[in-house]
A protein has these predicted regions:
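Short, basic phosphate-binding NTP loop
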Residues: 1-94, 108, 115, 279, ...
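Active-site beta-alpha connecting loops in nucleotide-dependent enzymes
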Residues: 3-15, 27-34, 284, 303-375, ...
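Nucleotide phosphate-binding/pyrophosphate-handling subdomain across enzymes
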Residues: 18, 118, 246-347
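Residue-level signal for inorganic ion chemistry
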Residues: 19, 60, 95, 124, ...
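Short active-site oxyanion
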Residues: 25-26, 56-59, 118-119, 139, ...
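Short beta-strand "acidic-cap" motif of Rossmann-like dinucleotide-binding folds
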Residues: 26-30, 120-121, 143, 219, ...
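Active-site regions of enzymes building and remodeling cell-envelope glycoconjugates
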Residues: 39-48, 57, 74-79, 90-93, ...
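Phosphate-binding loop of NTP-binding sites
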Residues: 51-59, 64, 68-201, 205-215, ...
Length: 425
């Protein structure tokens, strides 16, 4: 079988290794020379139009970040996610949303581990799913963090689907907001009445997806399911534990915990198990993580916050005065809601990157004036300016509400540079 491995990053390598079997004739295809070194002797097709000229291949395996719209072939377009779903022997809990996927997936994993289950965490937050497929047993559980890119053309849905808060994002890749939401909806599109959909009942797009689902539907947070009352988690009227057991900042993370509790409730209703699982997870890198305290000012790395809503969640996580670093490259976001939120806080904003002037325009419209634009910044100059402004007892947040490209390689590089700059103060 002639197979094209379309895209050769981390996932592309996993795809190559999985399909590198006797009888398969593999070719690696990418727009630029791959960052991962291809195996010797394997044919390469490199070029801007490489994905548009794949006729003659029986199978084209696209990496998640490659839009199926960019592939032209008379063969079948497939993905590692599709392959995993078609062959995984264990029940899959799939998690999607604009933000919180990795955190919620990790919380579900920790609760199931506390219940004594063997759990495999895969997707962006874990390892490439195909790398683990041979190890998974029918009695295990798989928790799969699923982006819109992975869900784009999926042909099966997980047994338990979790849809978190959805907002405008990735419009630099998706053709429209409708296309983005439609891709997310694949997580439940193939579910049946004996499957389960856990969804954010306070978000219009999550509810829109639920309206189309045939699965049993569980909204969160509600008085009948997982919710928070007076600093404690409840399921219905049953007390689970104090919210202090959750080692994560912000009410948005309490919502993520509620989604995780709902997702595992049919597997375990042991409140001590759930408490243990919630407490075990200390957070993922670059997700509102404490870095250091300098001169009575606390610094937090929230570089993963690439949308306005995630920056709003970071602002609401602290009552103290704040300095927030905002901006980066464009994802087509609307900053008007963030601009209105800024007026509710004692906060000074440092604006950087391509989106700095768009943010400033939104702030001007809302009447928020406590901001400055830093031209041609480095992370050291950004952090140094924050250090100069921040008063004792305040908080400095890197919560950019925009992508990182242009100034940094990716959100992780941005966060790592922030941590390094803070540690140099």
């Amino acid at each position: 079988m002639k197979i094209a491995i379309a895209g050769y990053g981390v996932e592309g390598v996993a795809n190559y290794q999985y399909w590198n079997k006797p009888g398969n004739d593999l070719t690696i295809v990418d727009q630029t020379h791959p960052s991962q070194k291809p195996p010797d002797g394997v044919p390469l097709i490199i070029g801007e139009d490489a994905f548009h000229n794949l006729n003659g291949f029986d199978l084209v395996i696209r990496t998640a970040g490659l839009s199926p719209y960019k592939i032209t072939t008379n063969g079948k377009v497939w993905s590692g996610t599709n392959e995993f779903f078609s062959r995984c022997p264990a029940p899959i809990i799939g998690v999607t949303g604009s933000k919180g996927k990795g955190t919620t997936s990790s919380l579900i994993t920790e609760i199931l581990k506390a219940a004594g289950k063997t759990v495999w965490l895969v997707g962006n937050v874990g390892v490439p799913a195909l790398d683990l497929l041979e190890k998974i047993q029918p009695e295990d559980y798989v928790v799969y963090e699923l982006s819109s890119f992975q869900l784009w053309d999926i042909e099966r849905s997980p047994h338990i689907a979790v849809v978190l808060f959805i907002e405008q994002e990735h419009l630099d890749v998706h053709t429209s907001m409708e296309d983005y939401v439609d891709a997310k909806a694949h997580i439940t599109r193939f579910q049946k009445s004996d499957d389960i959909l856990v969804y954010n009942g306070e978000n219009q797009y999550s509810k829109q997806i639920a309206d189309e689902s045939f699965a049993e539907k569980i909204a969160f947070p509600t008085a009948q399911t997982a919710h928070v009352v007076e600093d404690a988690f409840y399921y219905g009227e049953q007390l689970i534990c104090s919210t202090n057991e959750l080692q994560l900042v912000g009410t948005h993370n309490q919502d993520n915990a509620c989604a995780a509790i709902d997702a595992v409730w049919l597997t375990t209703q042991d409140t001590e198990v759930i408490r243990t699982g919630l407490h075990a997870f200390t957070g993922l890198p670059h997700r509102l993580k404490f870095v250091r305290e300098v001169s009575d000012v606390r610094y937090f790395d929230d570089s993963i916050a690439t949308t306005p809503t995630s920056a709003i969640a970071a602002l609401r996580g602290f009552e103290e005065p704040k300095v927030i670093i905002l901006g980066g490259s464009s994802k087509g976001s609307d900053f008007s809601t963030l601009a209105e939120e800024m007026n509710q806080h004692e906060v000074h904003a440092l604006l950087i990157g391509e989106e700095a002037h768009k943010l400033a325009q939104s702030f001007d419209v809302s009447g928020f004036t406590d901001y400055e634009i830093i031209d041609q910044p480095t992370m050291n100059t950004i952090v140094q300016r924050a250090h100069e402004i921040a008063q004792p007892g305040s908080v400095v947040l890197l919560s950019p509400s925009a992508a990182s490209f242009g100034l940094f390689k990716n959100y992780a590089d941005r966060g790592d540079q922030f941590i390094a700059a803070v540690n140099e103060l």
